[in-house]
A protein has these predicted regions:
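Short glycine-/small-residue-rich Rossmann-like dinucleotide-binding loops
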Residues: 159-161
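NAD(P)-binding Rossmann-fold cofactor-contacting core
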Residues: 110-134
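ADP-ribose/adenylate-binding Rossmann-like module
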Residues: 171-180
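N-terminal Rossmann-fold NAD(P) dinucleotide-binding loop
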Residues: 100-101
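Short acidic low-complexity segments
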Residues: 137-152, 167-169
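Glycine-rich Rossmann-fold phosphate-binding loop(s) that bind the pyrophosphate
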Residues: 95-97
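Short helix-loop-beta connector
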Residues: 84-90, 113, 173
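N-terminal ligand-binding/catalytic initiation module
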Residues: 1-70, 78
């Protein structure tokens, strides 16, 4: 588990230290997620990465963790999608912020045969905006997370706060790939 601290009930800060022995690199990703930022017109997630000299511990770089997260997270999902057998036709995405957009791009690149894209976001405008990027595929903005995943054989959730009620995936395709 990631080390976590909180200053508010609907917020988190995670520390993710790492050392890569083969390349002798050491650093830390520090990510904050604050649900109440939506109402303030601010990004939900902020992050930085600090790289240190492995010999002395001296900080040598401070990097924008937001951009790195924006690219890395859907990249990992893309590798998973590429190596799971099958040719999905119906993609469902729950959460249509920046991660939802990037995951849509990756899913369409890895699985160009997708014919349907369903999306849910509590902000229906964001769902519609993201769906406009799906090209000539059949698209639908869902009324709930459970509605979004109905019949899907590829499900991606990009939310970091718990859904209430919990997401029920029992109505997905029995062979669906679920990427939380």
């Amino acid at each position: 588990p990631k080390p976590k601290v909180t200053s508010r009930e609907d917020a988190f800060i995670h520390a993710m230290p790492a050392y890569l022995g083969g390349s002798d690199r050491i650093g830390l990703k520090w990510v904050a997620g604050y649900e109440q930022n939506y109402a303030k017109g601010l990004p939900y997630i902020y992050g930085v990465m600090i790289m240190n000299d492995p010999e002395t511990g001296r900080p040598v770089a401070l990097l924008d963790g937001g951009w790195i997260t924006e690219m890395r997270t859907p990249g990992v999902s893309g590798v998973t999608m590429r190596h799971v057998p099958g040719d999905p036709k119906h993609l469902a995405i729950v959460g249509c912020g920046l991660q939802g957009h990037r995951h849509l791009e990756v899913a369409l690149e890895v699985h160009p045969g997708l014919t349907h894209v369903t999306a849910y976001d509590r902000n229906q405008g964001r769902a519609q905006e993201m769906l406009s990027l799906a090209g000539d595929r059949v698209t639908r903005a869902a009324s709930s997370p459970t509605d979004a995943v109905s019949g899907a054989d590829l499900v991606i959730t990009t939310i970091t706060v718990p859904l209430d009620p919990k997401l029920d995936c029992s109505n997905t395709d029995p062979n669906a790939l679920l990427l939380p």
